[in-house]
């Protein structure tokens, strides 16, 4: 059978919090089968757990948060969640000694390296996928996102940014998902923001960790980072990275075709909730062997080495 995945060993890293600008220690721990993805704040006494759940997601101007019933939150979970989706990690406990996951370089790549350093272990329990059975679409003005039935996982994302630094030909990105494709094509794409927004937020004591080290920064005319872009279409690739993380908030890889136009965290989450709320639109599936498994989710040698 296709088995659930966790880590082989505990790994730790430090980084800076986007909101506070302070040092954060991140610890990733293996977890037993059927634990799911659990974020844990160890700076609170007692520690507070936040299971990944579409209904717990709140979108703020700076990041995605998980909020519990007592209005306690953990922030900036989206890029790590994308790395978990990319490598198909089903069970993990993620600890931080702060109210937020460190921003690292603004992409998912540092988290991918950390997960691969921990090693991926298979558990003796069937991995559950969410398979889309009916088309579900959500809209917000001219923005929209939808899932259609498809035996695999494809993503097709279009942005519409009128900015000299973003070429009109680099506003759409489509790909057939796989762990390899995620690592090579998506994981290194960084978040982006306007210099004026960062300066304004910092003047109000917010976004204190925001810098050229953890984002693509633009003014009205150009990219300000000395090293420029990692990809010509890094902006839309990062929006796809965000979507992969947002859609994994159900804790399961999804089998279906995702298409979006000008979508963001809030609309991606609205789509995920709309799918899960309609029992006719999806089902849990497991697979007995690789022959049945959609190509998108076959583990590359780098993951299960």
UniProtKB/Swiss-Prot annotation:
**Which Gene Ontology cellular-component terms appear in the entry?**
membrane
Domain of life, per UniProt, equals: Bacteria
Q: Name one GO molecular function term.
A: metal ion binding
Q: Which cofactor does it need?
A: Zn(2+)
Report the catalytic activity.
a UDP-3-O-[(3R)-3-hydroxyacyl]-N-acetyl-alpha-D-glucosamine + H2O = a UDP-3-O-[(3R)-3-hydroxyacyl]-alpha-D-glucosamine + acetate
Keyword DNA-binding among UniProt keywords: no
Give a Pfam family name: LpxC
Its Enzyme Commission number?
Answer: 3.5.1.108
Question: What function is annotated for this protein?
Answer: Catalyzes the hydrolysis of UDP-3-O-myristoyl-N-acetylglucosamine to form UDP-3-O-myristoylglucosamine and acetate, the committed step in lipid A biosynthesis.
The protein here is known as UDP-3-O-acyl-N-acetylglucosamine deacetylase
Which gene does this sequence derive from?
lpxC
């Amino acid at each position: 059978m296709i088995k659930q995945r966790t880590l082989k060993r505990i790994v730790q890293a430090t980084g800076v919090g986007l909101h506070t600008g302070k040092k954060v220690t991140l610890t990733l721990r293996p977890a037993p089968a059927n634990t799911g993805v659990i974020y844990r704040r160890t700076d609170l006494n007692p520690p507070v757990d936040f299971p990944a759940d579409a209904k717990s997601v709140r979108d703020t101007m700076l990041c995605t948060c998980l909020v519990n019933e007592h209005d306690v939150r953990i922030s900036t979970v989206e890029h790590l969640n994308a790395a978990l989706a990319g490598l198909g990690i089903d069970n993990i406990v993620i600890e931080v000694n702060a109210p937020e996951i460190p921003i690292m370089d603004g992409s998912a790549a540092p988290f991918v390296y950390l997960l691969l350093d921990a090693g991926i272990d298979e558990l003796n329990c069937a991995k559950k996928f969410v398979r889309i059975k009916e088309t579900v679409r959500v809209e917000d003005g001219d923005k929209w996102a939808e899932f259609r039935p498809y035996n695999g996982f494809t993503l097709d994302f279009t942005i519409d940014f009128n900015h000299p630094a973003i070429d009109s030909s680099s506003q759409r990105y489509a790909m057939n998902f796989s762990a390899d494709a995620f690592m090579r094509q998506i994981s290194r794409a960084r978040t982006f923001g306007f210099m004026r927004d960062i300066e304004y937020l910092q003047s109000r004591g917010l976004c204190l960790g925001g810098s050229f080290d953890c984002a693509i920064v633009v003014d009205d005319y150009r990219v300000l980072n000395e090293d420029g872009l990692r990809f010509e279409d890094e902006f839309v690739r990062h929006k796809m990275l965000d979507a992969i993380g947002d859609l994994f908030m159900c804790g399961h890889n999804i089998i279906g075709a995702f298409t979006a136009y000008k979508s963001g965290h809030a609309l991606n989450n609205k789509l995920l909730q709309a799918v899960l709320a309609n029992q006719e639109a999806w089902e849990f599936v497991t697979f007995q062997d690789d022959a049945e498994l959609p190509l998108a989710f076959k583990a590359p040698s780098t993951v299960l080495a």
